[in-house]
Structures are given as structure tokens and as C-alpha cells.
């Protein structure tokens, strides 16, 4: 559906990221096999905005591992929503400071400019466990060790793979709007909302609410 979306894009004010095919939501990477009714979804809609955020999260995780290196990271986590973004932490040898955060953000923009394909494949749960063990993603390794389903969907950018539940954008070129801010013991990746999908809102965290969320997720 990617080519068809490209042909219709100029009719839409925001980026098309998903498509309803005969009423069923699909990713743009799927192939059209027969005549059907299509309805495109943009980043200006809630489900489209969530898909965009999922893509930025994946881009961020890859940028962190690219910048710091797998062997120096004990754990990289996206915790919960803060303001208009997600609070994240990196556990490992490297000290998180403004210089490192700027390098991570620069790597994200670099990959967005490269418009790398985001591919999906279905793997056996055992393979997913081994993959996350190799990457040092201990929380995801534990998650899949006790999952009862036999297969899971894994997304990849080049050779880097990760698991996300939900729909994904077809390539990194869609992921143009984000900003990283140092915050508390980690940082926040700030992203647009559906109402203004090309505008990154200013970072205005509610500190009391943040500390309540932080305590509740320990």
C-alpha cells in the first residue's frame, strides 16, 4: 500500500502512516492483493500519532545502542508518559549528560534522513528470547520467556531488531519531529500530538505527577 499512499499523499495535510483495507487497519508495508476499499490514516489522527510515537521510540532505542555500544549498556528503558513524551533511562558504563544526549539525537536525525526501511518478521518466542539475551535487553528476555504464544512480531532497522506491540511506520523517513531533554535520572523524548503533528510542543513537565509515576513503577 506504500506506493498507493504516495500517490494520494498530496491530498492529505499530514503524513499517511496506516491504511484501513475493507475496514481492517493495516501497515503500509503490506501488499495489495485484490481490489478493495482503502481509507488512509495520517499522523493527525490518534492511531496515526501513536504509530508515529512507536516509530520514534524504536529509532531512539537504536540510536542509543549505536551511540553508546551494546557492550556498555546494561539496560535501556522507556518507562512512561511525561508531558508530551516518554521518560527513558540508560543503565550502564556511560554517564548520561547533555553531550551524549545531543549525540543520540543527532544519530536519530541522521537515520531519519537516510529513510531506512523498517521491516517486520514473525519469529518463534524462543528465538526472540535468545535475541534479547544477546542484546542485553533483560526485561524483554524475561517477558518472552514466560509468554504462552508461540510467535511474536519483531521489527528491524538494518540489523537492529526489537519488539513492539502495535502498528509501525514503514521507514525512518517518517520520523522527523522529536526532541530529547535531560530530566531527573534520565531523559524525555518529546514528540508532537495528533492536533499538531509537525510541531514539537515545549517541554513542561509536572514534577509532582512525575515523581508519583516514578514511585509507582519502581
Predicted regions mapped to residue ranges:
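Short, glycine/acidic-enriched capping/hinge loops at junctions between secondary-structure elements
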Residues: 6-7, 29-31
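Short acidic beta-strand-loop surface patches of small beta-rich interaction domains
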Residues: 16-30
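Auxiliary tRNA-acceptor-end handling modules of aminoacyl-tRNA synthetases
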Residues: 30-51, 63, 67, 72-82, ...
